[in-house]
Amino acid sequence: MVAICIKIGERERKRVHIMLLAYTWKTRVSSHQCNKSPIFGLFAIQFSNICSNLLLLQQKLSMGLSRYLSRRHHWVIQYCGLLLFLYLIYSYVATSNDGPNLHEDIPVFQGQGKDRANPNPPAALGDEALDPFEKYRGHEKIKWEDEAAYEKEKRREGPGEWGKPVKLPEDKEVEKEALSLYKANGYNAYISDMISLNRSIKDIRHKECKNMMYSAKLPTVSVIFPFHEEHNSTLLRSVYSVINRSPPELLKEIILVDDFSEKPALRQPLEDFLKKNKIDHIVKVLRTKKREGLIRGRQLGAQDATGEILIFLDAHSEANYNWLPPLLDPIAEDYRTVVCPFVDVIDCETYEVRPQDEGARGSFDWAFNYKRLPLTKKDRESPTKPFNSPVMAGGYFAISAKWFWELGGYDEGLDIWGGEQYELSFKVWQCHGRMVDAPCSRVAHIYRCKYAPFKNAGMGDFVSRNYKRVAEVWMDDYKETLYKHRPGVGNADAGDLKLMKGIREKLQCKSFDWFMKEIAFDQDKYYPAVEPKASAEGEIRNVGTNFCIDTQFKEQNQRFGLRKCTSDDKDGGGEQDLRLTRWHDIRPKGRKICFDCSTSVDKAPVILFDCHSMKGNQLFKYRVAQKQIYHPISGQCLTADENGKGFLHMKKCDSSSDLQKWAWQTVDNELLETRQANEAKEQE
């Protein structure tokens, strides 16, 4: 220190530099706008003022000491004092951090709008900056139901009103045009064009939802619809459903993110429509310059959003009545809560709106297929109360902008689609947040069918790469189980994971073992890492025809029947090695596609459908004594066609009918009896 001071003292001619130090630093900090750290910026400006005042004080002191010390010694003392002061300030800044800086060296994706809600406000601004939702607590609870809107919609008439199904006119030209639109969209877009953009839908909420009370003051929302080549009327109906069924004081904006669509109707005509119908003040369109994919499309919409809460929806949706307050109220109570609505069904053929079910918890199997877990007994007792869900379905959820950006938004290393729902779900739970489903918030969704309308993204196996990124960052040692069940994932190149691992470290997130034991605590019961032994397996021979059930490697929604048993005809081929699993469903060996019957009519069809391990339509019981395969939901028994050539169906049980008698190749009677007894207890 002394040596430096003497050296500086020898350079008296440059003493003006030190006097300019404070001014220069202050100017640079101000012009930079303290982007990296608002707190540091405020501190820097104050520090520069202190430096300036210190120099003025030094000048006064030097004037008072001039009669005792030489001019050279004056400057030596001043320089040494200033260096000592700088050293003390540096020591204070370097050691005064009481906790992890959650945003250091981690880019935060914020939009540049002047009205933007700052997702990471400086702690120095007070409690409201740390928790901006404090102002929404403590208010009276009110009913947000818009009775006038209900009455108005009740008077509507026309195709598809009240969510009723619509049929195509019987006309060859219409059928031809409808088929063309079907192939282009994956749903019946011709029917969509027949239905009003403002159509009414059936209120399919639980009856008690109409009596629910929510905070009288709730945060504002930005609703984000990413889309690519969406059919125009379906997209606009999604928009109008949100506008018509949302309190105007809560709906700040709707953002349509056009992911490089080429359809002419989605270009300038879309913006002209918004302007002509005077909704361009609330609906704005963002357009990408290249194909970004669903994940980055959502991220871009979030960056541009100005609402306090971000709501992500698919662009082929219709919001139900009073859908918004149930999503917002839990977030107002705790901004780290993510809320998902119940997702109902818009039929891809007829546009009928119908409920999917009355709730289930989201989960996954070890090949990373999205699955559902049954509600706990406690959750079933409160049909209107939000309940914890380990994993979101992906396309429908509400999250505070503050929490979304604290989590780093979506991992921008994920391409197109796939894995984003696991990535966000895991980090919400593991990083000290919570995720719930809100039964009184319902949004209907079109599940595309028959045709895959979009071009290949040309990015190789992006889904495996996405899964690898999620596994490497969040799943710890459990990732090996995923790699075992989905081998392509383990060999994929995950890319640079430094940023996402840095977020996990700085947020001090919990382990995946904690997630599996505390949040997805019963997943192993329904989707175990090791497949449990089957109760019965092998061929299922029909006594009346002496033929065996053959699923013939068919896919979802396809029917099947009987063929000559492969044990009788070694060259016959087919798919006859079946399993009666611990979940009481019947599936071909090595495949997760199950026997399914959804109706109780006479001769109800039996189809193949993705296994969900939740019983219901896929629950079958083998009655050993009668050799019947009983379906409790329909109350009927599996029946073969008389000549053995038709499809299998369900029919009223008749113990005397050989067409309803089935002989499994191998049956573990003790295991079967135990499992069926346990299943009966669960139903009590």
From Swiss-Prot:
<dbReference type="GO" id="GO:0000139">
    <property type="term" value="C:Golgi membrane"/>
</dbReference>
<comment type="similarity">
    <text>Belongs to the glycosyltransferase 2 family. GalNAc-T subfamily.</text>
</comment>
<dbReference type="GO" id="GO:0006493">
    <property type="term" value="P:protein O-linked glycosylation"/>
</dbReference>
<dbReference type="GO" id="GO:0005794">
    <property type="term" value="C:Golgi apparatus"/>
</dbReference>
<keyword id="KW-0735">Signal-anchor</keyword>
<feature type="binding site">
    <location>
        <position position="316"/>
    </location>
    <ligand>
        <name>Mn(2+)</name>
    </ligand>
</feature>
<keyword id="KW-0479">Metal-binding</keyword>
<keyword id="KW-0808">Transferase</keyword>
<keyword id="KW-1133">Transmembrane helix</keyword>
<comment type="function">
    <text>May catalyze the initial reaction in O-linked oligosaccharide biosynthesis, the transfer of an N-acetyl-D-galactosamine residue to a serine or threonine residue on the protein receptor.</text>
</comment>
<dbReference type="Pfam" id="PF00535">
    <property type="entry name" value="Glycos_transf_2"/>
</dbReference>
<protein>
    <recommendedName>
        <fullName>Putative polypeptide N-acetylgalactosaminyltransferase 10</fullName>
        <ecNumber>2.4.1.41</ecNumber>
    </recommendedName>
</protein>
<feature type="binding site">
    <location>
        <position position="417"/>
    </location>
    <ligand>
        <name>substrate</name>
    </ligand>
</feature>
<dbReference type="GO" id="GO:0046872">
    <property type="term" value="F:metal ion binding"/>
</dbReference>
<feature type="disulfide bond">
    <location>
        <begin position="594"/>
        <end position="611"/>
    </location>
</feature>
<keyword id="KW-0464">Manganese</keyword>
<keyword id="KW-0430">Lectin</keyword>
<comment type="pathway">
    <text>Protein modification; protein glycosylation.</text>
</comment>
<feature type="glycosylation site" description="N-linked (GlcNAc...) asparagine">
    <location>
        <position position="232"/>
    </location>
</feature>
<keyword id="KW-0333">Golgi apparatus</keyword>
<feature type="disulfide bond">
    <location>
        <begin position="637"/>
        <end position="653"/>
    </location>
</feature>
<keyword id="KW-0812">Transmembrane</keyword>
<keyword id="KW-1015">Disulfide bond</keyword>
<dbReference type="InterPro" id="IPR001173">
    <property type="entry name" value="Glyco_trans_2-like"/>
</dbReference>
<feature type="binding site">
    <location>
        <position position="291"/>
    </location>
    <ligand>
        <name>substrate</name>
    </ligand>
</feature>
<feature type="disulfide bond">
    <location>
        <begin position="548"/>
        <end position="565"/>
    </location>
</feature>
<feature type="domain" description="Ricin B-type lectin">
    <location>
        <begin position="581"/>
        <end position="684"/>
    </location>
</feature>
<feature type="topological domain" description="Cytoplasmic">
    <location>
        <begin position="1"/>
        <end position="74"/>
    </location>
</feature>
<feature type="binding site">
    <location>
        <position position="314"/>
    </location>
    <ligand>
        <name>Mn(2+)</name>
    </ligand>
</feature>
<feature type="region of interest" description="Flexible loop">
    <location>
        <begin position="448"/>
        <end position="461"/>
    </location>
</feature>
<dbReference type="InterPro" id="IPR035992">
    <property type="entry name" value="Ricin_B-like_lectins"/>
</dbReference>
<feature type="region of interest" description="Catalytic subdomain A">
    <location>
        <begin position="218"/>
        <end position="330"/>
    </location>
</feature>
<feature type="region of interest" description="Catalytic subdomain B">
    <location>
        <begin position="386"/>
        <end position="448"/>
    </location>
</feature>
<feature type="binding site">
    <location>
        <position position="445"/>
    </location>
    <ligand>
        <name>Mn(2+)</name>
    </ligand>
</feature>
<keyword id="KW-0472">Membrane</keyword>
<feature type="glycosylation site" description="N-linked (GlcNAc...) asparagine">
    <location>
        <position position="198"/>
    </location>
</feature>
<feature type="disulfide bond">
    <location>
        <begin position="431"/>
        <end position="509"/>
    </location>
</feature>
<dbReference type="Pfam" id="PF00652">
    <property type="entry name" value="Ricin_B_lectin"/>
</dbReference>
<dbReference type="GO" id="GO:0004653">
    <property type="term" value="F:polypeptide N-acetylgalactosaminyltransferase activity"/>
</dbReference>
<feature type="binding site">
    <location>
        <position position="448"/>
    </location>
    <ligand>
        <name>substrate</name>
    </ligand>
</feature>
<feature type="disulfide bond">
    <location>
        <begin position="209"/>
        <end position="440"/>
    </location>
</feature>
<feature type="transmembrane region" description="Helical; Signal-anchor for type II membrane protein">
    <location>
        <begin position="75"/>
        <end position="95"/>
    </location>
</feature>
